[in-house]
Regions:
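Bacterial N-terminal signal peptides that target proteins for export
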Residues: 2-25
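N-terminal signal peptide c-region/cleavage motif recognized by signal peptidases
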Residues: 32-34
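Extracytoplasmic substrate-binding proteins
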Residues: 42-43, 50, 138-220, 301-338
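Short helix-initiation/N-cap motifs at beta->coil->alpha
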Residues: 46-48, 103-114, 249-258
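Solvent-exposed loop/turn segments at secondary-structure junctions
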Residues: 66-69, 86-89, 123-124, 129-133, ...
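Alpha-helical, coiled-coil/dimerization segments enriched in small aliphatic residues
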Residues: 89, 226-253
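Proline-aspartate-enriched helix->loop->beta-strand connector
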Residues: 112-126, 258-274
Length: 338
């Protein structure tokens, strides 16, 4: 592909932006963060529920790669009896698979009640549409009789309660709450502090640009799946100095019409990379649609790719902001290292 202002980012560049995250995951896998003494019971807020823990869970199950990375970055691999929902969606990377070596995947997609009970789990880290469906067989209420307490991903709470726009505060809240639940408060504070510092560095670098209009393309052909105002990419784009053209939709991940994409004329398209359909195939599909030919991002071939675990709430979100900011405003990063 010829050079262009907003190229399809190479894996090499993406990797270069992840050193801190790699060190955090490595520390987690090596067990460098010992659990601090914690006073139990502890009570945390999970969506619209208060959840009390008499002691730290010892047989946890996490669903989805982003939530599993939260456990790893907090040094909690030894508390995992298993994980779910990574292999079936093809969201895992070699780095994550290596970090999870020795921990079984109990279900390739959403786990059943029977799977969680058979694992003798005492804790389920999931979210609405991240391992649970409203009204489904696996919910906090259905797990409780089995002694399984559930913590819900804050971003996903919009499915069960009124929620404001997604923000990094949601991710920080989840990490800090997990720190309290497992008695690793200091480790959680360290992780959150490192994330805040990297976000501040991006903000200093880009200053206050006129926000570019961005459409997030997750998947779909007849109707695209995208991020509304309540989904994490809205916060990622804001932190990177851009604007999600679907931010006014009071929904999380949602389907829209192609007509609405054309009407909002994004200058850049962010492709979420996961599943059997590659990012390159998604880009080619977009370029092949006559109805999108006049959209600025299509006309100028302005695409950015971010992996699934960076687009959904978790420790890789800062890497996504760094990737986005460098691609959107390369001149801000062209000078000497800051």
């Amino acid at each position: 592909m010829t050079a262009m202002p907003f190229p399809l980012l190479s894996s090499a560049l993406s990797s270069a932006l992840l050193p801190v995250s790699r060190r955090l995951l490595a520390a987690a896998v090596l067990g460098c963060a010992a659990a601090q003494a914690a006073a139990y019971p502890v009570t945390v807020r999970s969506c619209d529920r208060d959840v009390t823990f008499e002691r730290a869970p010892t047989r946890a199950v996490s669903n989805d790669v982003n939530l599993t990375e939260m456990m790893l970055v907090l040094g909690l691999k030894d508390r995992l009896v298993g994980y779910t929902g990574i292999g079936g969606w093809k969201t895992g990377t070699a780095r994550v698979r290596d970090a999870l070596r020795g921990v079984p995947e109990l279900a390739s997609q959403y786990p059943s009640l029977e799977v969680l009970a058979a694992a003798r789990a005492d804790f389920y880290l999931a979210g609405w549409n991240y391992g649970m469906h409203v009204g489904g067989a696996v919910t906090p209420a259905t797990l409780a009789p089995f002694g399984i307490r559930t913590y819900e991903l804050t971003e996903s709470c919009s499915h069960v309660m009124k929620q404001s726009a997604a923000s990094f505060d949601d991710v920080f809240r989840d990490l800090n709450n997990l720190g309290r639940i497992f008695g690793v408060d200091a480790r959680a504070a360290q992780v959150v502090g490192a994330m805040r510092a990297r976000l501040a560095a991006v903000s200093r670098a880009i200053g206050h640009p006129a926000p570019l209009r961005v459409f997030v393309y997750d998947s779909g052909t007849d109707k695209p799946m995208t991020a509304g105002g309540l989904a994490m990419p809205t916060a990622l784009l804001t932190a990177a100095g851009a604007r999600n053209v679907m931010a006014d939709l009071p929904r999380s991940w949602t389907q829209v019409s192609w007509e609405s994409v054309v009407a909002r004329d994004p200058q850049v398209i962010v492709i979420v990379d996961y599943s059997a359909v590659t990012a390159a195939q998604k880009q080619q599909f977009l370029l092949s649609q006559p109805s999108l030919a006049r959209v600025a991002a299509i006309r100028d071939r302005r695409f950015i790719v971010i992996p699934y675990d960076a687009a959904t709430p978790g420790p890789e979100n800062v890497a996504a902001v760094e990737t986005l900011a460098r691609a959107l405003y390369p001149a801000a990063f062209a000078g000497p290292a800051r």
